[in-house]
């Protein structure tokens, strides 16, 4: 099928797609392009071109709409109920067509519990052992290996992504715990009783996906006892550090968010991203504070 005048595109919806026989046949002959839901910039551009009331909406208004779902198909939907129904269909399709057949599990209830638990702890470092102990203490019989297998299945289906911990001094990976993020924060609406709770971690989820979209490998940083939300590593092994907070107008909150970045001794770029509209573009001894929505719309290079 190889011809000079033919470009062949093969699409798939999970990480299993290029495994096994197909990968053997295509080895060395393909370029894999990872596609995520819409970025905030793409979402805004669509509304500029198609939504006549866009001029009346602030970036914050658009962000509220964006967090309902960033799947392209939802742009054509006229009600939140329609979007909700679509997200339910997407979630069910992923679980019953991708995850459950691949894991070959009959315990769908436990798998669902693990998925919902990961959604509820978005942005919080969590270990497999802690997840297992949480379920066991609530009366659910589940093993470490089962939890591990379920999480791997949820990640292979591209429903969840993870960020491992990275020790900044010494540049080594830590195996203790990871953070997990949903492919679309709108899925929280069908997985959790209060999807709008914890807006700070929802923002963190959005920033994580944008870093992946921009081509970075993303880790959670550790400096002594302090956590850095993201260490973004480019293809040349250059680092950029990010702290993400909903707001830092309170001096105590600002100091707390700056402290981990201040503990870093190297000269790589450091950013504090918030939804603050006052005091943006401040610089704290090399730590640049930016409005997170401006950063999402910022055409920066890797």
Where in the sequence are the language-model features?
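Loop/turn-to-beta-strand initiation segments
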Residues: 4-9
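Interdomain motor-coupling "hinge/lid" segment immediately C-terminal to the ATP-binding subdomain
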Residues: 13-15, 19-125, 158
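Switch/connector loops and helix/strand junctions flanking conserved nucleotide-binding motifs
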Residues: 16-21, 41-44, 251-252, 279-283, ...
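Accessory nucleic acid-recognition modules appended to NTPase machines
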Residues: 79-238
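Nucleic-acid nuclease catalytic cores
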Residues: 223, 265-284
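Active-site ExK catalytic segment of metal-dependent nucleases
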Residues: 240-249
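Active-site-adjacent loop/helix micro-motif of nuclease/hydrolase catalytic cores
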Residues: 248-259
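Domain-level recognition of nuclease-like catalytic cores that cleave nucleotide substrates
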Residues: 277-302
């Amino acid at each position: 099928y190889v011809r000079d005048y033919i470009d062949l595109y093969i699409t798939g919806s999970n990480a299993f797609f290029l495994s096994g026989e197909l990968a053997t046949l295509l080895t060395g002959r393909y370029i894999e392009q990872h596609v995520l839901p819409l970025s905030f910039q793409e979402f805004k551009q669509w509304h500029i071109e198609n939504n006549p009331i866009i001029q009346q909406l602030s970036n914050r208004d658009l962000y509220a709409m964006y967090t309902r779902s960033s799947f392209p198909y939802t742009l054509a939907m006229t009600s939140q109920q329609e979007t909700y129904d679509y997200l339910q269909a997407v979630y069910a399709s992923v679980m019953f067509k991708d995850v459950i057949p691949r894991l070959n599990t009959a315990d769908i209830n436990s798998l669902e519990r693990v998925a919902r638990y990961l959604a509820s702890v978005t942005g919080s470092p969590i270990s497999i052992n802690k997840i297992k102990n949480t379920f066991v203490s609530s009366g659910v019989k589940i093993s470490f290996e089962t939890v591990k297998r379920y999480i791997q299945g949820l990640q292979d289906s591209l429903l969840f992504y993870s960020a491992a911990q990275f020790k900044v001094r010494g540049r080594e990976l830590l195996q203790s715990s990871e953070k997990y993020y949903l492919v679309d924060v709108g899925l929280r609406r069908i997985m959790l009783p209060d999807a709008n709770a914890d807006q700070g971690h929802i923002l963190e989820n959005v920033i994580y996906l944008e870093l992946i979209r921009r081509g970075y490998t993303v880790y959670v940083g550790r400096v002594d006892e302090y956590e850095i939300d993201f260490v973004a590593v480019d293809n040349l092994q250059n680092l950029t550090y990010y702290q993400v907070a909903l707001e830092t107008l309170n001096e105590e909150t600002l100091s707390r968010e700056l402290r981990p970045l201040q503990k870093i001794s190297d000269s790589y770029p450091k950013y504090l991203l918030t939804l603050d509209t006052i005091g943006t573009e401040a610089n704290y001894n090399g730590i640049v504070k930016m409005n997170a929505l401006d950063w999402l719309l910022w055409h920066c290079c890797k």
